[in-house]
């Protein structure tokens, strides 16, 4: 193979590389010098990357780790060649297994917060730099510097040490470091992080002096703007040099070496400056000085980049913690607008280091003015007065900027109010103390959720330097953070205003309920009349025939039905056992009667009274009384009388389809829940509290049974639960000692009494069926007229001829099996079953007769045709 061929060179290449590497190891001085002169930023970054190791975690131990390593290439190749698989998760769940700071912490007072205290971590001390000029030791110094960079994130301290290292190479008299910053208008400027670092100077001395330089002005500004280094032999001969600093410090600047510091995107993030070469070359910086300076500044760029990332992460973490605290605050405090805004203002002042915070609330009735103003100053943080806005402080609040922001709906950031010419009041020498004390100002509108309406304005005055206490302008970060703050302000204001509106609505509701309960209660004259009759004489149950299952109320007046009800309470020993006052009982009975609507054909007071009479007959004549407790008997009788209170003559289906407000209150058994609520309202109305003699536990138990009994009258619930009851009866496993079976039995008993009209003697049953049909047909007419739907046959007036067959179907599907089961529990309830069967026969006969009539009519019509 020929000498010049690629193959020959490649064959000898490994041996040459080894020789070169060995020679470089033996000549460290040359290696370091070559690296400093020739190394690029990419080489330095690659050098760092090579030394960043990821340590695999293997639960199977060393063996498992070895196995995983040995087969990793096979797995990766299979993964690459396979079909689309499960997407790789960016964050593994195991990442959260590492020890992290708790999300929620407690402060010294035990208050729960998302805002953690600043963590004080012990850091390794910086290695003191060595200033010997031995080039053979420069590599060691460089490695020491790299070690410090990898373990520290303090920009000032690291750059101070870098300058001291540089001093050993280029021997300048002074060094300075300037960082690039932006103001609220995104205009760049330079701030000194280190100024006049000299041999023997301390970090504190170099970092105390803070100087601001304009962009593209002066030597430093020019280097920052162009991104190119400058090596000036005589500063006073350069027109870009600003001699004011020398005049202030009394220092004579001669030669300057100024270089930009760039990040990985080649953006200028800072400028380093060396002043006055101390020895050699006539006091001017050489080309070697430039290369050495540039090499070390590459490390400055790395330091700045890492530190900026770290500071950004800390700032974002702090911001998130504060915003989480604000979110927590909003959910904790919703009752008082003043309290929540006081806490929000305190958070803003302490976090953003401002002198004053004022929150203006827009007047809803007059959008050109503010309804309330909440003002706080930094001196008040420790006091946190109960009242933020005081009359004596009115002259310390400036409303004009807030009014401007409210009208424009845009943020306002004024770096120096005295120099701003946009507002006429800033140019007038009014002598206003408030105007004179404002230097920098940041004002942001607080908008509602729809972002199209300003509900308030947040105004911050005078941002303070953390160390010096001097006023400085608000920057873009402040604007962004305040924008986030006012979102939470808006949420807090809206939530609190909604809470206050709900409280006002509840107060109005209480007044309305008070008025309704007054009008819902029976009149005093009617109560006294019934009380007088009851005191004179109340006929016996036998005389009134209220123990008969065949009882009819058609011949009784409303007053007589009330007397019958009093007799029921008396004969069931409820008046005596629960210390009911006769006046209260009379008023309650008449109030219940009053709250049934008279324009409803069937579900009115008479139906409720008949349900209660059937319950009384079942308890007495049906011998069920001895199976129940006194509280259960009391609850059942109250429920029977109240189970259809305020019935509107329509069923639950109509309420839902018509989108009645009642449908929004309950998800099921709409009318039954409403009946119970009405029952509860009457029981709690003054003068109607027949349960006042009960203990707290007895009262709770009674209300629970009443509610269950009233809800049980919903036929949908009855159909859902009856199977279990019938199965227990069929298997002869029914046991009233079991609480669940007892509750089930009370529900079935309530339904049996509610449907008891189907068991009455035929003349009574026919008359009641007509009332039911009238009510159902009225609902059908409303469905056709209001909802534009065709009603079901049961509600359809045009299907009136189907009433007999529908009654037979109703008895077979709903009633018959219920009364059969009830008779198994108590044989004395057989009259209910017997009456139901007899009425079925009557309805069946009518249905057959109507069917024959219909068939005959169709035959006659066919013959005529």
UniProtKB/Swiss-Prot annotation:
Residues 69-83 have a biased composition (Low complexity). Pfam families: GAF (PF01590), PDEase_I (PF00233). 3',5'-cyclic GMP binds at residue 807. Keywords: Allosteric enzyme, cGMP, cGMP-binding, Cytoplasm, Hydrolase, Magnesium, Metal-binding, Nucleotide-binding, Phosphoprotein, Repeat, Zinc. One of its GO terms (molecular function) is cGMP binding. Phosphorylation is regulated by binding of cGMP to the two allosteric sites. Phosphorylation by PRKG1 leads to its activation. Pathway: Purine metabolism; 3',5'-cyclic GMP degradation; GMP from 3',5'-cyclic GMP: step 1/1. SUPFAM superfamilies: GAF domain-like (SSF55781), HD-domain/PDEase-like (SSF109604). The active site is at residue 603. Residues 526-850 form the PDEase domain. Binds 1 Zn(2+) ion per subunit. Binds 2 divalent metal cations per subunit: site 1 preferentially binds zinc, while site 2 has a preference for magnesium. Tightly binds zinc. Binds 1 Mg(2+) ions per subunit. Binds 2 divalent metal cations per subunit: site 1 preferentially binds zinc, while site 2 has a preference for magnesium. Binds magnesium less tightly than zinc. It is an enzyme of class 3 (hydrolase). GO terms for biological process: cAMP-mediated signaling; cGMP catabolic process. Isoform PDE5A1 and isoform PDE5A2 are highly expressed in the cerebellum, hippocampus, retina, lung, heart, spleen, and thoracic artery. Isoform PDE5A1, but not isoform PDE5A2, is also abundantly expressed in the pylorus. It catalyses: 3',5'-cyclic GMP + H2O = GMP + H(+). Inhibited by zaprinast. CDD domains: HDc (cd00077). It is found in: Cytoplasm; Cytoplasm, Cytosol. The modification Phosphoserine is found at residue 92. Mg(2+) binds at residue 644. Belongs to the cyclic nucleotide phosphodiesterase family. Plays a role in signal transduction by regulating the intracellular concentration of cyclic nucleotides. This phosphodiesterase catalyzes the specific hydrolysis of cGMP to 5'-GMP. Specifically regulates nitric-oxide-generated cGMP. cGMP-binding to the allosteric sites is stimulated by 3-isobutyl-1-methylxanthine (IBMX). This is cGMP-specific 3',5'-cyclic phosphodiesterase. The gene is PDE5A.
